[in-house]
């Protein structure tokens, strides 16, 4: 098995799914997983994209050292050129000097494929001359596909396609085939967008006298509008999800469900079960919807299932400011690990991604809360000042400070003002945390402490008439 990404941008979630499918299939078959970086597009390749591929694979559990590679397609240039020469010398390819504009003028249509004009001109290599494969004039090419059966392609409808540029460098079709042959690849799992290339590549395998691999074209991943996921339009970079605080286990679980389902009525499935149950033959050939809302829900489930120590450890990059997004509004020396540990079980049940921990606990580590003015306007209605006066007095007089005491006290004060507990909580919550929603209020007050709570209530009271 091989996974062959191109280092031309951020690592795509669709690529991550293909990598996982190849990884599992290789383990199931007792085979070898090969990482081959297809780096022949010199104008677009960047070393940081290659490093990003390696880091992304490591994040989803495909660690360096557990596979062969990375190999680089550019290092096989000699083999590519040798294969092109072999095809030319064997009469299976010919040189052509037709430009796209000339072909269009000759055929009268920009959509018509190459017309075979140079097939019998016996041109040799030279400037402006590409090498084209001589497609058979009859018959059909049958692709054996574990997911799609045996798609059949009429050879007469396959144009004589370019396999090498005028400078001798191979195009993707030839380089890909030669690399797979060189590496002894027996199965190719890739996205269905490559299916139109497959009969051409299979013809190349046949022409080079080597048995082609077994193919498996997995369904394309689409957005909610059923459009193929686009780097320009959609959130597709695996790194972006990692940096936002998605868990690798949740991401892997979700990606494997794009086109496949485990046994039973379940979706949250342990990875060992996925590795055991996954079957390429069971993959649905229809397009797979990448539902970010569902992924968030998955991630929330995985977060809630973490042991509390792992949850606390997982939040550390955002709490300490070492994460790449969502920097905390407090200074490193203001962070109180003990206070966070006290509220961590409460926060764990309320966030869907780890980066959401910051706005849920920032009130604990700041001298004054960050007031959401919209929340303030909704909570501080007429009578809020009188309510806060009474709450301040009652909280000051409490003999002990804990969640039960503050709750019963606020409930009593609210009743005196004709308010149920939910209504009475709103101005207190905004005054203390800056927000209308968040962690359970009374447990938060206990951790915050009496003096800091009263200081914030008094500051809020000063803003009111």
UniProtKB/Swiss-Prot annotation:
ATP binds at residue 231. Its EC number is 6.1.1.17. A motif ('KMSKS' region) lies at residues 228-232. GO terms for molecular function: ATP binding; glutamate-tRNA ligase activity; tRNA binding; zinc ion binding. Keywords: Aminoacyl-tRNA synthetase, ATP-binding, Cytoplasm, Ligase, Metal-binding, Nucleotide-binding, Protein biosynthesis, Zinc. It is an enzyme of class 6 (ligase). A motif ('HIGH' region) lies at residues 5-15. Its main location: cytoplasm. Binds 1 zinc ion per subunit. It comes from the Bacteria. Belongs to the class-I aminoacyl-tRNA synthetase family. Glutamate--tRNA ligase type 1 subfamily. HAMAP family: Glu_tRNA_synth_type1. Catalyzes the attachment of glutamate to tRNA(Glu) in a two-step reaction: glutamate is first activated by ATP to form Glu-AMP and then transferred to the acceptor end of tRNA(Glu). This is Glutamate--tRNA ligase. The lineage of its organism: Bacteria, Bacillati, Actinomycetota, Actinomycetes, Micromonosporales. The gene is gltX.
């Amino acid at each position: 098995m091989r996974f062959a990404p191109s280092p031309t941008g951020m690592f795509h979630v669709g690529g991550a799914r293909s990598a996982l499918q190849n990884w599992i299939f290789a383990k199931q078959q007792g085979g070898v997983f090969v990482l081959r970086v297809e780096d022949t597009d010199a104008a677009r390749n960047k070393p940081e994209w290659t490093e990003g591929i390696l880091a992304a694979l490591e994040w989803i559990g495909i660690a360096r050292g557990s596979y062969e590679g990375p190999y680089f397609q550019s290092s096989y240039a000699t083999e590519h050129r040798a294969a092109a020469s072999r095809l030319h010398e064997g009469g299976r390819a010919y040189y052509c000097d037709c430009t796209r504009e000339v072909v269009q003028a000759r055929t009268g249509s920009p959509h018509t494929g190459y017309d075979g004009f140079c097939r019998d001109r016996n041109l040799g290599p030279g400037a402006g001359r590409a090498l084209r494969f001589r497609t058979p004039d009859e018959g059909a090419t049958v692709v054996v596909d574990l997911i799609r059966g045996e798609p059949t392609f009429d050879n007469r409808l396959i144009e004589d396609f370019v396999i090498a540029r005028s400078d001798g460098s191979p195009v993707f079709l030839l380089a890909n085939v030669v690399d797979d042959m060189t590496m002894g690849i027996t199965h190719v799992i890739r996205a269905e967008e490559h299916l139109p290339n497959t009969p051409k590549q299979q013809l190349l395998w046949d022409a080079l006298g080597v048995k082609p691999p077994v193919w498996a074209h997995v369904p394309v991943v689409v957005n909610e509008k059923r459009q193929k996921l686009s780097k320009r339009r959609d959130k597709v970079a695996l790194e972006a999800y990692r940096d936002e605080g998605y868990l690798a286990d949740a991401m892997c679980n979700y990606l494997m469900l794009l086109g496949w389902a485990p046994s039973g009525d379940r979706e949250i499935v342990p990875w060992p079960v996925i590795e055991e149950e996954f079957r390429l033959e069971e993959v649905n050939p229809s397009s797979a919807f990448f539902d970010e809302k569902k992924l968030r829900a998955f991630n929330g489930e995985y977060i809630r299932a973490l042991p509390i120590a792992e949850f606390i450890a997982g939040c550390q990059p955002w709490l300490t400011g070492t994460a790449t997004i969502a920097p905390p509004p407090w200074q490193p020396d203001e962070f109180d690990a003990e206070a966070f540990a006290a509220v961590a079980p409460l926060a764990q049940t309320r966030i869907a991604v780890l980066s959401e921990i910051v706005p849920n606990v920032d009130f604990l580590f700041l001298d004054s809360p960050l007031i959401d003015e919209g929340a303030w306007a909704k909570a501080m209605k007429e009578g809020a000042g009188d309510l806060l006066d009474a709450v301040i007095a009652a909280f000051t007089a409490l003999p002990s400070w804990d969640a039960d005491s503050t709750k019963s006290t606020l409930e009593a004060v609210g009743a005196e003002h004709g308010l149920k507990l939910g209504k009475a909580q709103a101005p207190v919550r905004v005054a203390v945390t800056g927000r209308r929603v968040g962690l359970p209020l009374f447990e938060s007050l206990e951790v915050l402490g009496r003096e800091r709570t009263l200081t914030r209530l008094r500051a809020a009271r000063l803003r009111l008439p």
